[in-house]
Amino acid sequence: MESIILPSPDLHDVIGKNLQDVPDKSNGTLNRSRLASFSTTRDSSISWGRRHHHGSWLHSLGCASIMTLCPLIVIFYWIALSRFDGSLTSTYKTMAMMGPVNFLWQHAPRGNMRTNVGYGAWLLFQGILYQFLPTKLSSGQLTPAGHLLKYRTNGLSAWIVTHALFLISSCCGLLDPAILAKHWQALLISVNVYGFLLSGFAYLKAHLSPTHEGDRKFSGSILYDLYMGIELNPRFGKYFDFKLFHNGRPGIIAWTLIDMSFIAYQYQIHGYITNSILLSTFLHILYVVDFFINEDWYLRTIDICHDHFGFYLAWGSMVWLPSMYTLQTQYLSINPHSLSPLAAMTIFALGVSGYVLFRSVNHQKDLARRTKGKCQLWGAPADVLRVTYRTKDGKEHESILLCSGWWGLARHVNYLGDLILSYSMCAACGTNNLLPWTYAIFMTILLIHRCWRDEERCSKKYGKGWETYCQKVKWVIVPGIY
């Protein structure tokens, strides 16, 4: 589901395998399938990986601007919540009147060493769970250099252990359940510092000790490479995948812990808990638990298969996700909003409907992958398009593109379920303030941009096969509209 975050999957790559192991289907023995081939003309760089940029000053300026503005946006939102009752307008007017430098000097969050140590302990704890909890080894997709990597997918166990310890410690009086909310400003400093350090470390590791040299991408610009990343799958040892750990452990597990802490904070300062904060948190939990139950699915998303590990993913997963995806509970903890039974039921129904759509779409993809396209979708044989692509080692592989079921309605219909669920999460906060709706607005922009990236990547990867697919499935996200 994103993003940065919980990204929505790149679900077009349903199956990838070496063609020498695939029987010839061109004689029509597989009903309703066609084969489209694609050959690359580049020897030094496979065209369907991340694009090579040549370090123009414009790219460098853009990366520097994003790496500067994004942390400031996080700080700006915290100031709006803690100093101006969540009003973005009042916060902006005050900043314009005081000047940005004086405004930040007076209102910016302050960190402390105790919180830094606590955050370091959190990272260490999650690293121990990642490494030592029982796990199955799941396969990702072939990288552009031809590597098929195994991943430790024990995220659900890590989520359960973490939340069980949090709840037990809170119930036994060993831990203040509102501890995260009460130390939120210092935590924002800690996560930002770590996000920048992590980005720098990933940059240096890619130069000094790369895991898979063939899957690195260099642009010629230090800033662009720092932002977008160089290594595709940086690792320590055989199975400690740096990208999967940071994308899928500390930040996303913290998401629901932060929600619970702000629920406790609302109770401590107001004396009651509203149905709106419970509803928003329930939808978050549904989202996160589903992510971990289907963690092997995440290995086939654009985050793992396409994006290299730089500031975009490192800082985004460690800072943007836990700070901006929890805005609804942050806002409701200090601005309690009670929903009528009808409103609560409507929002709940919409949110669950979005989730069911998202899960149904993913199920169809997984079914086609497991059966190699020989399955029934909506009572009819699956309509699949078989396409080929090459990896950097020169081997040709086959993938399946679904053209029926949900995937016959739109090429990215999975994003529609994402958006319905995202807007439902924000709707629990009411319509009096724009701030808690930031998540839905961000997801809309992110998913549309991701569509463009996905379309470009698949076009390069599959060539004429992708053109044929687009002719069969004309709509992008919303059938009949876009």
Show the residue positions of the predicted features:
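Membrane-anchoring alpha-helices and their flanking helix-loop junctions
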Residues: 2-404, 420-482
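A short amphipathic helical element positioned immediately N-terminal to and/or at the very start
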Residues: 405-410
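Conserved beta-strand->loop/alpha-helix structural units within folded catalytic cores of enzymes
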Residues: 411-421
